[in-house]
């Protein structure tokens, strides 16, 4: 039976692949496809570009060149720079190519047309020129969105690539130390692109490099997942170089939530002056009044400055949140039209892609491109039910009665080709996790509401539900209240997920009943009047007498507030005997 089902599913998938390929051929092209929308968002986000070359000129070229006046030939080996691997589609005759000097005036003007600031650095000469150029490139590129490097900046041909490799290595280490960042590095060269790629891969082994698409280096190292090095041919002219840099940057960020993130950051940057105008220095006296009010209260005096800080941050956060919620650019990045275009983009990248739905614990059901698009845009109930009834059908849950009810009652997992449980766990963890060992920075954990700990003795997990006001100004041994939460396998029913330390994710089933409440006594830090964790064998721990609790992270405020509310509701339930006839009349 299972074998027949597998064979049937295989036939359905093969049929769907043919339909998907046909759909990509006959589909009507929308005014702006998903990649174009992503490129527009990326272009608005990019602010800074750095270009480094040994042959930079800072004056405008005297003459322009017309296509009809040019007879372009690919350089041969006699140039001493190797054979060019450029294709005819990469050549543009509107401007001189990069085999000549890099004209900063033209480069900066091309980026300026897109409201992007471009800085240039000319390689140093002299005995220590290489090292000085590496240091200067590193310093100027640390905060740049895009760095453009010439591969051949050295006087000695045998040393070609030393400056580029040295600067890139320092940037990669800087990004790893800072837990990663979005970074694109472009290298233009007259040498064979595969040769340069191999040289780069051999140089950066500690960062787990891999050659992708025969043109770029990506990294398996987790902190460098948003960094790539792209190698292009010097025959590319300046205008094409600018367009290529934005295009490659877009390939790194082209996604639904990543587009929304870029649009949100751009919106915040654009509103910087608006926020400074609103929170201007004239409000300083009013803020000091708030601090004085806290200091005047005996109950708040010891932590007045921390409370005032939280108040200020909440003000700023709410203001930014309000702006993002009404931002047309952010809304557009996740609009209905964008969601409609997204499946087309996935199929265009790989026509062999199969979309699947998994409803609850049932088998995966493959669906066509057009069916996915209709489900994403449907608003009418009967139309929705008709789409669900199409072949291949979703498995009907006997307790639900209809496929539409099954769709409503069970969790829905959308899949591209293979099982993507990890991606769903990641989004769940992002929703739930406020802090963990990876993103805590210099923060030393404090025991308070929302903190998740593991008791070493029995390996059980607990979340602190102590009221926040009872977690500060602690002077002596104090009871802290916890709720025991069950760690469950990632494939089992769960209510909360956080990023783990020894494992990628920790999934929990939180039962707010009173039977799971647990209490332990802790001594506070004498100076801070709070229970602070201490570092032991690379882990933060809290000690309650002989009991040791490992700090695993913290839930975000809405998450732990919801848990506390559920516990309170459970404790507030009232049970009493009543007249059965009257009780049953309630329904």
Describe the predicted segments one by one.
Residues 2-50, 54-146, 151-352, 469-587:
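Extended charged low-complexity segments that act as oligomerization/scaffolding linkers
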Residues 324-446, 451-463, 484:
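Flexible loop/N-cap segments at domain edges
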Residues 466:
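Phosphate-binding/switch region of NTP-binding enzymes
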């Amino acid at each position: 039976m299972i074998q027949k089902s597998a064979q049937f599913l295989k036939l359905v998938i093969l049929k769907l692949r043919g339909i998907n390929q046909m759909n990509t051929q006959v589909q009507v092209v929308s005014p702006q496809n998903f990649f174009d929308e992503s490129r527009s968002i990326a272009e608005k986000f990019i602010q800074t570009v750095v270009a480094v070359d040994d042959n930079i000129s800072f004056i405008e070229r005297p003459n322009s060149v017309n296509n009809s006046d040019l007879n372009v030939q690919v350089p041969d080996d006699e140039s001493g720079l190797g054979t060019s691997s450029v294709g005819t589609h990469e050549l543009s005759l509107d401007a001189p190519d990069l085999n000549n000097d890099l004209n900063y005036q033209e480069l900066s003007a091309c980026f300026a047309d897109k409201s992007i600031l471009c800085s240039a650095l000319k390689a140093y000469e002299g005995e220590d020129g290489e090292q000085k150029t590496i240091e200067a490139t590193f310093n100027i590129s640390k905060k740049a969105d895009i760095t453009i490097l010439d591969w051949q900046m050295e006087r000695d041909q045998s040393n070609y690539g030393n400056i580029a490799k040295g600067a890139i290595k320092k940037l990669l280490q800087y990004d790893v130390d800072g837990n990663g960042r979005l970074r694109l590095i472009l290298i233009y060269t007259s040498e064979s692109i595969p040769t340069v790629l191999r040289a780069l891969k051999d140089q950066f082994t500690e960062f787990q490099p891999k050659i992708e698409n025969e043109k770029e280096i990506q990294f398996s190292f987790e902190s460098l997942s948003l960094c790539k090095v792209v190698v292009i041919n010097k025959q590319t002219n300046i205008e094409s170089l600018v367009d290529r840099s934005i295009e490659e940057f877009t390939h790194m960020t082209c996604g639904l939530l990543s587009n929304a993130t870029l649009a949100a950051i751009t919106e915040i940057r654009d509103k910087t002056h608006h926020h400074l105008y609103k929170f201007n220095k004239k409000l300083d006296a009013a803020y000091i009044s708030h601090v004085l009010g806290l200091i005047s209260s005996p109950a708040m005096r010891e932590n007045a400055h921390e409370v005032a800080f939280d108040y200020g941050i909440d003000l700023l956060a709410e203001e930014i949140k309000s702006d993002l919620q009404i931002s047309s650019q952010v809304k557009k990045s996740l609009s209905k039209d964008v969601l409609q275009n997204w499946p087309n983009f996935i199929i265009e990248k790989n026509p062999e892609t199969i979309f699947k739905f998994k409803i609850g614990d049932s088998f995966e059901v493959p669906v066509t491109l057009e069916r996915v698009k209709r489900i994403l845009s449907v608003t009418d109930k009967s139309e929705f039910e008709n789409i669900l009834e199409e072949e291949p059908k979703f498995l009907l849950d006997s307790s639900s009665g209809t496929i539409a009810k099954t769709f409503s009652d069970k969790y829905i997992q959308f899949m591209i080709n293979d099982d993507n449980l990890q991606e769903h766990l990641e989004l769940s963890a992002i929703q739930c996790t406020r802090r963990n060992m990876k993103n805590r920075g210099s923060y030393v954990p404090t025991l308070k509401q929302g903190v998740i700990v593991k008791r070493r003795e029995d390996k059980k997990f607990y979340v602190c539900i102590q009221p926040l006001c009872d977690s500060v100004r602690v002077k002596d041994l104090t009871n802290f209240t916890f709720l025991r939460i069950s760690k469950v396998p990632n494939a089992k029913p769960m209510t909360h997920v956080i990023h783990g330390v020894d494992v990628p994710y920790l999934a929990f089933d939180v039962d707010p009943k009173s039977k799971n409440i647990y209490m332990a006594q802790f001594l506070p830090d004498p100076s801070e009047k709070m229970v602070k964790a201490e570092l032991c064998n690379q882990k933060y721990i809290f000690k309650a007498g002989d009991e040791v609790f490992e700090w695993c992270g913290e839930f975000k405020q809405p998450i732990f507030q919801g848990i506390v509310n559920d516990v309170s509701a459970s404790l507030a339930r009232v049970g009493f005997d009543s007249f059965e006839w009257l009780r049953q009349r309630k329904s």
